[in-house]
Amino acid sequence: MEERAQHCLSRLLDNSALKQQELPIHRLYFTARRVLFVFFATGIFCLCMGIILILSARSTQEIEINYTRICANCAKLQENASNFDKECTCSIPFYLSGKMMGNVYMYYKLYGFYQNLYLYIRSRSNRQLVGKDVKVRLNLIWYNTLFLFLNQVDFSV
């Protein structure tokens, strides 16, 4: 008979608050003091992060070198298909005014091209991005002229 009683007890559910789904409820009570504390603490945190970012941005050094016309001979050399095996080296000497600390990154800049602009998407050339010289397509001549015209117009009032 004892075995039967133990068998019945093992089939009963555990009497825990989790299994009986009687967990206590936790509710947030918003008071003016708590809301203002969180608001000002967030503001102070954002202010500190902004100061840190501004100070780190001031320590960067930037050098801009325009190489548009310096390496034009390489593009002319590669226009002729018979020169496919000839190498063209383009070097641009420049001098640094001081020592650069940390990592050095090099970027290039394109003027008048915006990635989300419809005309930029039409004018994108993967061959040019790889570094090969490309000729101007006829359907983009009007865009280039419009761009030159807009650069010459003075929009200031």
Swiss-Prot record:
Coiled coil: none annotated. It holds the Pfam family CDC50. Its main location: membrane. Residues 56-157 are extracellular. It is a single-pass membrane protein. Glycans are attached at residue 66. Keywords: Glycoprotein, Membrane, Transmembrane, Transmembrane helix. GO terms for biological process: phospholipid translocation. InterPro entries: CDC50/LEM3_fam. Residues 1-34 are cytoplasmic. The chain crosses the membrane at residues 35-55. It is found in: Membrane. GO terms for cellular component: endoplasmic reticulum; Golgi apparatus; plasma membrane. Belongs to the CDC50/LEM3 family. PANTHER family: CELL CYCLE CONTROL PROTEIN 50, CELL CYCLE CONTROL PROTEIN 50C. This is Cell cycle control protein 50C. It comes from Pan troglodytes.
